[in-house]
Amino acid sequence: MVELEILTIQNPEHLRILRSKSRQVQAVSPKLVAFAEQMLDTMREANGVGLAAPQVGVLQRLFVVELPEDKENEQPRETYILFNPKIVKGRGEQIGYEGCLSIPGYIGEVTRREQITVDGLDEKGQPVRLKVEGYLARVFQHEIDHLDGILYTDRLTDPSTLQPVETGEEEAAELEAASMGAAMS
């Protein structure tokens, strides 16, 4: 499958798209599901854990998330494709570092809800309600922000927490910070 181009904030036209609010998906079609699969492939190739449609230039309310297998804790890989996601409930607070494929070379500290309930549509167009917590809740909130034109840098706890990392290593640095900083929540 052909990889999609991931938009970055360095390009003014890309930034305009990234700052735009996405439209609701009218119908979950086979073509749209194939596009979501293409997004997953692109995200995997970029070593990401989440990708929202605006990050590949499509202003529709769709994101994909995939948490890698955690052999140490015997957790299988978790893959999510969600259309028209909406946070309907949240509680608790966690502080942690986030990176973004659209902001290469940086991570920053962001406060998010510890647990959220999200309504949306699955790949069959069926309504789903997901209750997620911890790191997965952080990733879902980050991707839903993209659908509203919000970048994680808009939510930094303090601008001084934005720090450079090797380009392409944002997600790895974020995962490392999450595993070391579980007590940060």
What label would you give each PLM region?
Residues M1-S185:
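Positively charged
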